[in-house]
């Protein structure tokens, strides 16, 4: 489909939702079933991610840890590698670009580090899908969320996510 080409993920399935918030909630709730999980997020996540994770934190189902950035808002890859060694990630959720600071995450590099630890990787591209290229077709990315009404220039009410066919949501 054209959307798969635009997101550079021809082998992934597309699931449509009314909003990116709903897409993120479906993914997060589906991934956090079962035993307690360790979830890493960036310091720049949207409330759609942080509020949902906070709810699961209160239930004792998740430990939420933040990826380290330095004083210049750059991701410290060596420090993140150490973080992952100390506390193995089950899930990594990261905004492709912050809706506040505009900081673009090194998605490819961070997803490889997370996958080396066996984590499921979720990329929130609500601000960037169709605007800033991201190779969401990589095997290291399990889910990529998009908002149709933002930089895809579609109508309101068309959002969703691309997912690997082997991705497992409960």
What does each of the following model-derived ranges do?
Residues 1-170:
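Pyridoxal 5′-phosphate
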């Amino acid at each position: 489909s054209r959307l798969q080409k635009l997101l550079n993920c021809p082998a992934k399935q597309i699931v449509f939702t009314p909003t990116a918030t709903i897409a993120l909630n479906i993914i997060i709730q589906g991934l956090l079933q079962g035993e307690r999980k360790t979830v890493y997020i960036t310091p720049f996540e949207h409330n759609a991610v942080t509020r949902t994770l906070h709810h699961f934190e209160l239930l004792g189902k998740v430990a939420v840890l933040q990826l380290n950035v330095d004083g210049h808002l750059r991701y410290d890859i060596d420090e993140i590698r150490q973080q992952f060694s100390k506390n193995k990630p089950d899930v990594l959720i990261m905004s492709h670009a912050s809706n506040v600071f505009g900081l673009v995450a090194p998605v490819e590099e961070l997803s490889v580090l997370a996958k080396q630890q066996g984590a499921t990787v979720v990329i929130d591209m609500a601000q960037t899908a169709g605007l800033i290229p991201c190779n969401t077709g990589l095997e290291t990315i399990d889910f990529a969320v998009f908002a149709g009404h933002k930089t895809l220039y579609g109508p309101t009410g068309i959002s969703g996510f691309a997912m690997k066919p082997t991705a497992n949501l409960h």
